[in-house]
């Protein structure tokens, strides 16, 4: 029978060092609140029940933590009396009788399911407490994991460690798994007879051993256990997250010419044989199909780019943009809630908003779909194989039929039938010699002003 597990995620900190008006767990990593990354890691470890211990911004934190397939119950920690006290804020959930209790933190967004699964396996193998540790070249300030004969005998804090113990490089991450049948008894035995008068979760090691229990430790990569307390640490976490995801994508067949300049969102999807040039930014909701090309300095969010389509350079795709197979959005173009059919081209200096463009149509430079009247948005529909001349304004709602031509510089306010030519501009007039008169007049005015000065 599969073991049941409750993850207790501690997210009630005051976030003082973050210097922010909101809880640190709400700050984004790859466009997603860091607390959501933690819940995703927990879910990947096969855990579908979460007790979320909250404090500041409780409702916002609970909302940000919500992801599909995970049952989350929030518990308010009214006082900050240490990690042991925080876990017991979820006493009601722990008491439901899970086989495993996994304790993790809402400000450790790089954690993955591997160490969490290893900790749970330690419980399945007979341990009462399993601590997740990490090896580091910079152990100063961390509690050291002291192991003897395969068992964890103590977590020694820096200030209490001997010189020999300070040479230990295996450190406590703070994450641990506890035998669910014994968890409440063990947690209730944690005291606060220390300088700060707080209840420390690390005391479980000594408590479990004193009761004859087995305590072990498992290892995790140091970077995955990085906590986020300051903006500087947030930047480090963002950098590593990006490096890890870029590497995964390149191994899956995506070409990135200068990967260190490409920034991905948590849900970015890029297909095999897609090419991403330097300095491209993906916001949430971007899907790039195989064989697409994203040229340099483009920004894509909430958009779909089909197979063989081309974007940029210097293009912006906003939510709702959907580029058909082999279509093109070129330099200095913006598309918002616009669909381009197969082979359609929007080559340069164009805004497409709330529009449908048929297959094979060509949109000339400087064209604008005028979609907003100050109150409401309206749609522009352009049929297949239409040609829109440069510097045209299409005032929505308006429909351009299949194969229609729009003369350059036109302002189109009325529907254009299929295969028709529409002109909406003033007739050109030529006044011979008038430029000379205008120039002489301007020079005379300039000379008069100079004489008065």
Curated annotation (Swiss-Prot):
Binds 1 Mg(2+) ion per subunit. One of its GO terms (cellular component) is membrane. Residues 232-252 are annotated as: Linker. Pathway: Nucleotide-sugar biosynthesis; UDP-N-acetyl-alpha-D-glucosamine biosynthesis; N-acetyl-alpha-D-glucosamine 1-phosphate from alpha-D-glucosamine 6-phosphate (route II): step 2/2; Nucleotide-sugar biosynthesis; UDP-N-acetyl-alpha-D-glucosamine biosynthesis; UDP-N-acetyl-alpha-D-glucosamine from N-acetyl-alpha-D-glucosamine 1-phosphate: step 1/1; Bacterial outer membrane biogenesis; LPS lipid A biosynthesis. Residues 253-453 are annotated as: N-acetyltransferase. One of its GO terms (molecular function) is magnesium ion binding. UDP-N-acetyl-alpha-D-glucosamine binds at residues 10-13, 24, 77, 82-83, 105-107, 143, 157, 172, 229, 318, 336, 351, 362. Its EC number is 2.7.7.23, 2.3.1.157. Its cofactor is Mg(2+). PROSITE patterns: HEXAPEP_TRANSFERASES (PS00101). Acetyl-CoA binds at residues 365, 371-372, 390, 408, 425. Disulfide bonds: none annotated. One of its GO terms (biological process) is regulation of cell shape. The active site is at 348 (proton acceptor). Its main location: cytoplasm. Pfam families: Hexapep, NTP_transf_3. Keywords: Acyltransferase, Cell shape, Cell wall biogenesis/degradation, Cytoplasm, Magnesium, Metal-binding, Multifunctional enzyme, Nucleotidyltransferase, Peptidoglycan synthesis, Repeat, Transferase. Mg(2+) binds at residues 107, 229. In the N-terminal section; belongs to the N-acetylglucosamine-1-phosphate uridyltransferase family. Catalyzes the last two sequential reactions in the de novo biosynthetic pathway for UDP-N-acetylglucosamine (UDP-GlcNAc). The C-terminal domain catalyzes the transfer of acetyl group from acetyl coenzyme A to glucosamine-1-phosphate (GlcN-1-P) to produce N-acetylglucosamine-1-phosphate (GlcNAc-1-P), which is converted into UDP-GlcNAc by the transfer of uridine 5-monophosphate (from uridine 5-triphosphate), a reaction catalyzed by the N-terminal domain. Homotrimer. This is Bifunctional protein GlmU. The lineage of its organism: Bacteria, Pseudomonadati, Pseudomonadota, Alphaproteobacteria, Hyphomicrobiales. The gene is glmU.
């Amino acid at each position: 029978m599969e073991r049941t597990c409750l993850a207790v995620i501690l997210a009630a900190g005051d976030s003082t060092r973050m210097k922010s008006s909101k809880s640190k767990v709400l700050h984004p990593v790859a466009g997603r609140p860091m607390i959501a990354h933690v819940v995703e890691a927990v879910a990947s470890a096969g855990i579908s029940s979460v007790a979320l211990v909250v404090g500041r911004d409780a409702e916002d934190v609970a909302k940000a933590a919500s992801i599909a397939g995970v049952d989350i119950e929030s518990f308010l920690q009214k006082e900050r009396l240490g990690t042991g006290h925080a876990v017991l804020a979820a006493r009601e959930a722990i008491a439901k009788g899970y086989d495993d209790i996994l304790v993790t933190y809402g400000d450790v967004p790089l954690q993955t399911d591997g160490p969490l699964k290893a900790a749970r396996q330690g419980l399945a193998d007979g341990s009462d407490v399993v601590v997740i540790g990490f090896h580091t070249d910079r152990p100063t300030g961390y509690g050291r994991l002291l192991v003897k004969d395969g068992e964890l005998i103590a977590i020694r804090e820096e200030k209490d460690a001997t010189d020999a113990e300070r040479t230990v490089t295996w450190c406590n991450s703070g994450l641990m798994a506890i035998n669910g049948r014994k968890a409440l008894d063990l947690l209730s035995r944690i005291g606060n007879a220390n300088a700060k008068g707080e209840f420390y979760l690390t005391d479980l090691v000594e408590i479990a051993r004193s009761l004859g229990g087995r305590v072990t430790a498992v290892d995790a990569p140091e970077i995955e256990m990085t906590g986020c307390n300051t903006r500087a640490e947030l930047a480090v976490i963002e950098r590593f997250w990006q490096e890890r995801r870029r590497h995964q994508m390149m191994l899956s067949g995506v070409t990135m010419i200068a990967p260190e300049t490409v920034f991905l969102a948590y849900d970015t999807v890029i297909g095999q044989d897609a090419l991403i040039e330097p300095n491209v930014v993906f916001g949430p909701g971007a899907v790039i199909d195989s064989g697409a090309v994203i040229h340099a300095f483009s920004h894509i969010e909430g958009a779909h780019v089909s197979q063989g389509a081309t974007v940029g350079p210097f293009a912006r795709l906003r939510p709702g943009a959907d580029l058909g197979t082999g279509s093109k959005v070129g330099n200095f173009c913006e598309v918002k809630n616009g669909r381009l059919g197969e082979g359609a081209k929007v080559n340069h200096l164009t805004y497409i908003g709330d529009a449908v463009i048929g297959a094979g149509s060509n949109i000339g430079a400087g064209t604008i779909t005028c979609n907003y009247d100050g109150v409401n948005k309206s749609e522009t529909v352009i049929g297949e194989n239409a040609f829109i001349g440069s510097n045209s304004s299409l005032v929505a709602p308006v429909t351009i039929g299949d194969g229609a031509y729009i003369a350059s510089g036109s302002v189109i306010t009325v529907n254009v039938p299929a295969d028709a030519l529409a002109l909406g501009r003033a007739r050109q007039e030529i006044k011979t010699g008038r430029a000379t008169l205008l120039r002489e007049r301007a020079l005379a005015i300039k000379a008069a002003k100079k004489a008065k000065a």
